Amino acid sequence: MPKRTLQGVVVSDKQAKTVVVRVDRRFTHPIYKKTIRRSKNYHAHDESNEFKPGDMVWIEESKPISKLKRWTVVRGEHKKTA
């Protein structure tokens, strides 16, 4: 079975080798037919402490690394600075 991959934005990098990634999803409400946005935060392993808040990253499922970490950062794009 292939590993799931999600795309999100880094919201925190305060932990060592860990980033918190916000993943947004959109769906249509089954009764009201309105498009709704929901988000969820995932703790992901960042071995090189490379990513900072605002960066776009892709995370992939992995075996449990700690109590909260079950995802690993695969690749990312750094936020453009002016």
UniProtKB/Swiss-Prot annotation:
Q: Return the GO cellular component terms, semicolon-separated.
A: cytosolic small ribosomal subunit
Q: List the disulfide bonds.
A: none
InterPro entries recorded:
NA-bd_OB-fold (IPR012340), Ribosomal_uS17 (IPR000266), Ribosomal_uS17_bact/chlr (IPR019984), Ribosomal_uS17_CS (IPR019979)
GO BP terms: namely:
translation
Tell me, what is one Gene Ontology molecular-function annotation carried by this entry?
rRNA binding
Keywords, in A-Z order: Ribonucleoprotein, Ribosomal protein, RNA-binding, rRNA-binding
What job does the chain carry out?
One of the primary rRNA binding proteins, it binds specifically to the 5'-end of 16S ribosomal RNA.
* Assembly description: Part of the 30S ribosomal subunit.
User: What family does this chain come from, according to its entry?
Assistant: Belongs to the universal ribosomal protein uS17 family.
Stated name of the protein: Small ribosomal subunit protein uS17
| Biological source species | Bradyrhizobium sp. (strain ORS 278)
What is the phylogenetic placement of the source species in the record? Bacteria, Pseudomonadati, Pseudomonadota, Alphaproteobacteria, Hyphomicrobiales
